[in-house]
């Protein structure tokens, strides 16, 4: 949990630094990954986490670099997942007054994955998401993470429910 707090503090500090440089564009979200593999569920049914999108003011197509951290279990039975992705978010508008609309997105890249009985391994995969923009830069999204293989029966595949804010 301490690492989760450190990641959130890093994200908030990055927001301040980017704002001072005249750059905008961080999306910070908190939530939990709910793994689909039986081995991962046995260690931690929910893995709290944070994800940060670094948006470039030069990217007109919504491309971002995404870094995340999810952790579940404790002691020797801890599972850690660190997604490092190239992501893209596609906006849409809403017919409902007061809502910013639905959006979709995808990401592809590496998952650094640490499981009981194993050192950190690199798995290749990606995620797909659908989200809802709310007033004030707030948003909620559902993501599905998928990698092509597992490590000792553990896998970071599963659904993540996130809530966040765009700065």
Regions found by a protein language model. Name each.
Residues 121-167:
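A generic hydrophobic-segment detector
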Residues 33, 70, 145:
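Active-site beta-loop-alpha junctions enriched in small/polar residues
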Residues 1-25:
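Cleavable N-terminal export/targeting peptides
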